[in-house]
């Protein structure tokens, strides 16, 4: 898999929760590792970045499931290859050299992957 995770944080929206359940099943993650977070029921880049800063440092790999335009903006913030839109059911993965989630807003990722078709 391109994605690995210890925990899935998801918006409380029905479609986001359903996506999280499918993702957990696909990645063999126990459903108890899905955490519903009302803070992720937002379309704001700033609010999602603030949530990321509060992730417990016991986790080194997390998945966030949420909403646009916030996730498109986060992808563009960390990637040199800008996109117009992160479509439904698409993802991007970031890797950082840090053990502290509160630091990543100021860091450049050491890798960036996505499952977007070219030209999106």
Predicted regions mapped to residue ranges:
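Non-DNA-binding regulatory cores of transcription-related proteins
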Residues: 55-58, 63, 68-90
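Phosphate-coordination/substrate-recognition cap region in phosphate-metabolizing enzymes
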Residues: 1-60
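Residue-level signal for well-ordered alpha-helical positions
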Residues: 22-23, 77-78, 97
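Short, flexible active-site-adjacent loop segments at beta-strand->alpha-helix junctions, enriched
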Residues: 14, 40, 68-70, 90, ...
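Domain-level recognition of soluble alpha/beta enzyme cores
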Residues: 81-117
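An N-terminal RHG(E/S)-centered segment typical of histidine phosphatases
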Residues: 1-4, 57-59, 106-108, 114-120
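Low-complexity, flexible helical/coil segments
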Residues: 43-47, 70-73, 98-103
């Amino acid at each position: 898999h391109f994605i690995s995770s210890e925990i899935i944080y998801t918006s409380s929206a029905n479609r986001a929760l359903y996506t999280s359940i499918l993702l957990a099943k696909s990645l063999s993650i126990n459903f108890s590792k899905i955490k519903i977070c009302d803070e992720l029921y937002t379309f704001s880049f700033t609010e999602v970045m603030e949530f990321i800063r509060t992730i417990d440092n016991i986790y080194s790999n997390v998945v966030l499931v949420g909403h646009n335009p916030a996730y498109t903006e986060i992808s563009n913030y960390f990637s040199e290859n800008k996109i117009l839109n992160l479509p439904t059911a698409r993802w991007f993965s970031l890797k950082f050299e840090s053990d502290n989630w509160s630091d990543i807003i100021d860091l450049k990722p050491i890798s960036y992957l996505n499952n977007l078709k070219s030209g999106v």
